[in-house]
Regions:
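Short, charged/polar micro-motifs that form catalytic or ligand-binding hotspots
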Residues: 18, 92, 110
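DNA major-groove recognition helix of helix-turn-helix/homeodomain DNA-binding modules
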Residues: 115-133
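N-terminal cysteine/histidine-rich coordination modules
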Residues: 1-62
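Recognition helix of helix-turn-helix/homeodomain-like DNA-binding domains
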Residues: 98-112
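Short, charged recognition helix plus adjacent turn
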Residues: 3-11, 135-144
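Alpha-helix N-cap/N′ positions at the starts of helices
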Residues: 8-12, 69, 85, 97, ...
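A short, Lys/Arg-rich alpha-helix, primarily the initiator
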Residues: 63-87, 130-135
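Short alpha-helical "recognition helix" segments of helix-turn-helix
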Residues: 85-95, 102
Length: 144
């Protein structure tokens, strides 16, 4: 069970869902956060219940309430790569995420979510690096 204080905090600035008919709602962070919205808020961000994918087993807004193994930090990421390849990958990631965000990922300030991890992997493959990326650490975290 997720701490209620975390749900209250996240609910105020998170896209929530109110569709209790969705087959995934029992394990969806968005639905759980929606239950903890403060009454003082007049309006909130929520998913459109009329969207064709809403309330299906393939809901595009679904976020699991189970912690996932999330990498953090890329300080040692390039150690085994040739310098030319390192520069090419770094340039692609900065172009995609901005310099500030790239360095936040690199320092481990931001978790490397599954979609970011896929982008990093694709940048490595596009630049010719075939080994799996190595991150500084891995933590079990919720992916909001």
């Amino acid at each position: 069970m997720i701490d209620e204080n975390i749900l209250r905090e996240k609910a105020q600035k998170y896209i929530v869902c109110f569709n209790g008919e969705c087959p995934l709602h029992d394990h969806c962070l968005r639905w759980q956060a929606g239950r903890y919205l403060p009454e003082r808020l007049y309006s909130v961000y929520c998913f459109n219940p009329n969207h064709p994918g809403a309330a299906t087993d393939n809901c595009p807004g679904f976020r699991t309430d189970q912690p996932q193994r999330i990498p953090r930090g890329m300080v040692h990421f390039y150690e085994a790569m040739p310098g030319k390849m390192e520069r090419a990958i770094k340039a692609r990631l900065i172009e995609r995420y901005s310099r500030v965000t790239y360095y936040r990922y690199r320092r481990g300030e931001y978790p490397i979510t599954p979609d970011v991890e896929q982008t990093i992997l694709q940048a490595c493959r596009d630049c010719g690096w075939t080994a799996d990326p190595v991150y500084d650490s891995y933590n079990d975290e919720l992916v909001w």
